[in-house]
Design a protein with these regions (language model features):
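Hydrophobic alpha-helical segments
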Residues: 1-192
Length: 192
């Protein structure tokens, strides 16, 4: 289906149900700030789960958020090959392995994922990792289902940094009227 066939999709954004938008914002503000797991790892996990799920919109958002956190473009690009990249520690790889598996389907997660996680993380930290993956799954499904038109700042970043590793905006392009006006950080939905 061509992007132009998603007529009126901007009318399906969460802000048209203000109570839902506010509750989702509360959840984002609870899950994403650093606690036992820092913000960078949380955004790496979110972006990895979005890569596995195939939501191009969330891939651009997660990557742009990593950029806003000061993560080098090379590390963001290396997420596409994290298993062999020297940019990532064994602890990060364990978290990203879970994110990729759960991002595909929870049924893909294996006991070995938890064996590796427990080498690096406490139970509380693993719960945080799971929360990021679960919230990411909700956002992936919402945004990919309605083919959200990605904001320009995220698109500009993704075109520059992600396109060289195979990213494209897919169905998440459209008219200026349909386009989101900014990244969630810009709107205060989530803190940097």
């Amino acid at each position: 289906m061509a992007a132009t066939e998603y007529e009126g999709r901007q009318n399906l954004e969460m802000h048209h149900w203000p109570e839902l938008r506010e509750k989702v914002n509360e959840l984002l503000r609870l899950v994403f700030p650093g606690r036992g797991i820092d913000g960078e790892l949380k955004q790496l996990i979110f972006t990895a789960a979005s890569l596995a799920r195939g939501c191009l919109h969330c891939q651009s958002h997660g990557s742009y958020h990593l950029h806003k956190l000061g993560v080098a473009d090379e590390k963001i690009q290396a997420l596409w090959s994290y298993r062999t990249s020297p940019e990532f520690s064994d602890a990060e790889r364990a978290a990203l392995d879970l994110a990729f598996a759960a991002g595909i389907s929870p049924n893909v997660v294996e006991p070995e994922n938890y064996v590796e996680l427990r080498k690096h993380y406490s139970n509380d930290q693993i719960i945080e990792i799971l929360a990021v993956i679960a919230v990411g799954g909700f956002l992936n499904r919402w945004n990919d289902t309605i083919a959200t038109v990605t904001d320009q700042e995220s698109i500009d970043f993704a075109e520059r940094v992600l396109r060289p590793v195979g990213w494209n905006s897919g169905k998440h392009t459209g008219s200026a009227e349909e386009q989101r006006k900014g990244h969630p950080i810009t709107f205060g939905y989530i803190d940097k």
